Amino acid sequence: MPLAALLEDKASRTGRRHQQGALELAQRFQRLSIAAREIAASVMYGVHGRRRAGAGETFWQFRPFVSGEAAARIDWRRSAKDDRLYVREREWEAAHTVFIWICRSASMRYSSTLALEPKIDRALVLGLAIADLLVRGGERAALLGLTPPLSSRGIVERFAEALMMQEAAASEEPEALPAQTGLPFGAQAVLIGDFLAEPERISAMIEGLSSRGARGHLVMVTDPVEETFPFEGHTEFIGVGTPGRLRAGRAEAFRSEYLRRLAAHRAAIERAARKQNWTLTVHRTGRPATEALLALQVKLESASAALRLAQQDPQS
Amino acid sequence: MIPSLPLAFAYPAVLAALAGLPLLYILLRITPPRPALMPFPPLRLLFGLRPKDDTASRTPWWLLLLRLAAVACLIVAMAGPIWNALQEAKRPVGPLIVVLDDGWAAAPSWDERAAAAARWLEAARRSAQPAAAVPVSGGGREITFIDPDKALNRLHALQPQPVLGNRLAVSQAIESAAARYPRPAILWITDGLDHGDAQEFAQRIAAVSSSVTMISSGRVIYALAGAENKPGGLFVRVLRSLAAGPAQGIVRALDRRGLLLAEASYDFKGAKETTAEFSLPIELRNEISRLEIAGERSAGAVFLLDERARRRRIGLVSSETADTAQPLLAPAYYLKKALAPFADIREAKPSAADPVKSLLNDHAGIMILADVGVVSGQAHDALARFVEDGGILVRFAGSHLAGASDDLVPARLRRGGRVLGGAMSWEAPKKLAPFGRDSPFYGLPVPDEVTVSRQVLAEPDPGLAAKTWASLSDGTPVVTAARQGRGLIVLFHVTADTTWSNLPLSGLFVAMLRKIVDLSEETSEGADSKTAGEPRAFEAASLAPSRTLNGFGALGAPPAGVTPIPAGFSGPAAPEHPPGYYGPPGKSVAINALGPDETLSAASFSGLGFQEEPLRVSGPIDLKPWLIAAAFLLLAADMLLSLWMSGNLRFFAPRTAAGLVLLLGAILAGPAPSSAETGAADISPRDLGAALTTRLAYVASGDQKVDEITRQGLISLSRVLARRTSLTPGDPVAVDPARDELCFYPLLYWPIVATRPQPPQAAAAKAAAFMKQGGTIVFDTRDALNARPGGPPTPEAKWLRNLLEGVDVPELEPLPPDHVATKTFYLIDNFVGRYTSGTAWIEALPPVPPDGTARPARAGDSVSPIIITSNDLAAGWASDPSGESLLPLVPGGERQHEIALRGGVNLVMYTLTGNYKSDQVHVRDLLERLAH
């Protein structure tokens, strides 16, 4: 029978090991991403030109100077060619913003002997790694409710810092679900957690987040024990996060029913996600983190491609 | 009490609690094991589930069994179980006669015998019956029935006797006792030996009483008999009473002071008799005075040896030279044949310049000169001194002796001789007269067929009769003897071959020689210093006991009532003269419990209707602590198992368990291969190679760089040695003094690396042994650059001091300029290596004698076992094949490399040739060369 344990509260806090793990994973992922690029060959990432003048790097057009404008904006080289004054306009370029949320509730501290690491470690590593990957690709990443969108190179350290500060300040248990604030249109959300809350709450949360048209991805981190229910004999189950105990005389008798309920729970979440055009990825801590990262990246890219198309449509 | 098992309980009532076990079984069965606590995040999903079968799983049957066994153990332990509880003897119905075989055969199990007898006497006391304890050794003493308490006291005073008693005498006493008290109960505690009377005794007591119980130990009885000191070794017969029991064992040989000299193993191989052999040098064999079977405490298992069992070493010189061509014509042939059974004969090598002296140097106790006429001056003096010091000189007449004259004869001889029965004589060959009382040959039968046809004659001086040991029927002496100093000169007036007499063909000849040889110990003891020629009684009429064995085989003062044995007594021990030594010290005669050809046989008592009881050997064993320990272990196992089942035993993970199983397996399987290895300890090919070729060796320090330089240095030195000297050494080898055998290497180079750990104690001990056995170790501290004279010791010096702590290092001195090591091949001043400033320390030579004869080279008695230098010799030697030094030298130069190599050559030559070069033979050459 596999054994399971909860991490100590202290041990579960965001720390150096998560930064290190995330950076290593992202590094490793660069090699994996060669394969990923072939899958998503058509998808480009980075800064996306908006086909109109605005803040950006690349040249868009020269336009005549309008009096009242700041003189500093005059492009003197072009203006010297004739008598008129020109202003150099650049194409408006905007990066996508991805909001990341990492569940740090008590149930995430669960780890069994079948798992490679506790769920929270896996979630933090995944979240920080995807942030690093995005920033290196030119996108902006934000920790939902904690940081503004950032594109600094040291995104992992910044995020980790923000997480640690919140953990140090927070007096109560972190929530199992993020606050239902609407995300801006065009933004994407990456929610990493075990999503063991009631499907109705999850559905409400998704709807709240996507109220302004944001898309999102749920990454469900589960322990292999939660998937397979390999218990036998006289066993007393102790709730994690939720109060309650359950004494099973013969644990193996619960297995089939539990597995059915788990599948139903998943299906409910997936339905809620699909309704808002969100995606759901199930990741087991018994598997390496790269799997989840690859899947998540592909989904992010396809989503941003779709988003770009959606944004271009009104222009053309 | 269980009849079939020797198991009893102190409180049998407690066993009733065992009935509660089924109840416990039910209780345990319905109490489930403690649930495993399992945190489970998706617990919400489980709420409200109602599985079909949710009865708690029950305690597994094996755990139940374990607990029941633990409880059963406890209950049985509380009942006070006793294994082998002493059972009460049956109470006798009539007066009880306890007949106790108390010969030596009963000694090994005496305590149990006494305890069995006591048990019966106790029973008799309880039933208020009179009793008698009758030891067999008591013989036909009248049996009086007394109070069992008194009988017990008497029993406790009994000790096993060193001889076997006469049972028939006891049976008579029993018969007469039975006439007075009818129908006695008889208990016979027998030793199981049938020494001629067991069957009859059994029948007779069976006739007396209908209630005969016999207790026998069933033990196999071992004994020694008939030790013989043969030419090849000392042989002793080992006997046992039954062809059962352990077939192998050890006979130990002890000397007079009780020190162990040797052990010999024996193996019965199913038979009842075998032989143990001590193949020792004769000097050691002659020291043996007592043989005993190890682990067998009885007088029968002890064999005492006296002077008669010693073998003498006899030097034999004969005048003949071509003995081997016609052996029957040579006197030595007859002498060898006659003496070989009881003495070792040494003959001088054919090439020996002076056979007499060489044999005397061989520590012969008796010298026999067969017809040797003239003994040369030096040999004569040596012989005279030999006789003065207690040796026996036996001479045989012959043509040489008849024509010569010397004073190493007991009586003056008439020149010429006397021929009887020859063509020119008128008398028939004479026969021997019976021996006189004063003669050591007294008592030997004189066979009729011995005739003497020729002899040398003694001058009829006064006192000749006293010197005569044997004479012809007409009174002319044939054997004369005279004391000289502490020794004895014996002259046979006839030859040792058959030309003058047929005495050498008779058994008398052997007996006479034997008597003479027996005298040798006496004379060498030097007990008395009688003047030459004085008559003396060679044997006392009777020998008083000096020390006797008790029943357990220990020597002690003889008990009262032991009678002296007559002189010449050679039978086995009897009650009136138990085994032991008789006679004065130095001349004592050993009497043993068993005669030389005696055997042991077990008695058989089938068909007599005796009740037989075994002699209980093992005492009662209280099983309580064992059972409690077992219960404790079982409960501990139960606790561990319960913990494991509820998942709280983390460390008892499968991996750990597998490790434990492997470890157990390794422990169980481990010793087998190692014992196989020790069985066949082969010589490693490396040792074989080292033994076949002389090679230089170095101690691997473990520092790779240093070891490589050392190896290169020794290779270079070996190359130079092969090129310049007659020594062609093999490739140098690295040795580990702790592991490798060092004795193959004359020279061991040991570079000191202070950073390496000290070698184990065994390595230092082996190095010390190597130095003791004549090896030389060159310690090179390689620190000549860092060391300052008078300054603190360098780390290397400290390391070396640590190493040599506890090693017996001789006194050292700086290499003196005239030390032989500086002259053995080249003339050098110092051992130079990579550096030149260091001093070589070597074993201090004896100081120059005060008369001051200046010698160019001095040497001690042996090679210095240790040389300590700091010049890094190996680095100085190391060169490439073309002779270029591999390392930069300090101060440097081609010359220094050459001098270093020369020092190395000298060093090797010194260890191989020792002080040879200090010989005066070379002094002139050395002086000449020193003058240049």
Predicted regions located by residue number:
Chain A
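Exposed, interaction-prone extracellular/peripheral surfaces
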Residues: P2-R51, F59, P64-A72, R78, ...
